[in-house]
């Protein structure tokens, strides 16, 4: 009788730097115990589709490859959200996939949405319709927090956050130089739907003049007054860092379309602020830059010593 344990691992939600390194850690730890690792492809879809999409991962075919040093997700990911009324159905499909593969546990590497779903799978929270299926099946679900927003609780820094800060900080440094050359106030719009950690860290590290975050409602007059103070000090340029999900003094999001499941999709607040500043203060021209997906794609370990890890050659 084969008593070898089988564990699954999947990445869910938006990708970020460090995912492949986490997968490698799971593979290596399992290999030391003689366990088998099933990499589920394309997030939860890989486990709920027929046939199940997976790849057996080993130290030989994965850990020793170039992938653990690169950003993105080797397994692929999924970022479309789940309606609460469909969570029970999805839980059932998820459970069937786990049973079909014979998994003893599954590791979910995801952000706040994925962690909430993990909690629902295990506890039946969030909706009265949610079946307590996986707990009844005795499934062990392990959540590893990853998000460039750094908005998952009970962890100081989530996987992907530091690399995203580095990208945004580099952008602030670059914008400071070009803003000085053209005597402009440049706006950097960064990700951050409900949390301003990314904007705050980048603004502090890059010494930006203004930082706007979702947690603190902003007033356009305060921004104008700061720009006037910068001008009065004799400096001819400024940099503003803004989270995509900031709110006005009434607590309202100013920009935000909806996706297919009714969640707000943010973006465009930089252009809005630029127009508002230009209407009220003519001393600075404004321009807008966005880091967007670049925050997700900085390599976990960058090439060094003249060697490119992507092609494994000099």
Q: What does each of the following model-derived ranges do?
A:
Residues 264-314:
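C-terminal non-catalytic interaction/assembly regions of soluble proteins
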Residues 154-165, 296-303:
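Short beta-strand elements at the ligand-binding edges of bilobed clamshell
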Residues 6-14, 73-78, 105-109, 186-189, ...:
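Short glycine-rich or small-residue beta-strand-to-loop segments that form or flank ligand, phosphate
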Residues 2-51:
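N-terminal phosphate-binding or glycine-rich loops at protein starts, especially the Walker A/P-loop
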Residues 97, 105-111, 116-120, 129-133, ...:
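Accessory alpha-helical/coil subdomains and C-terminal extensions
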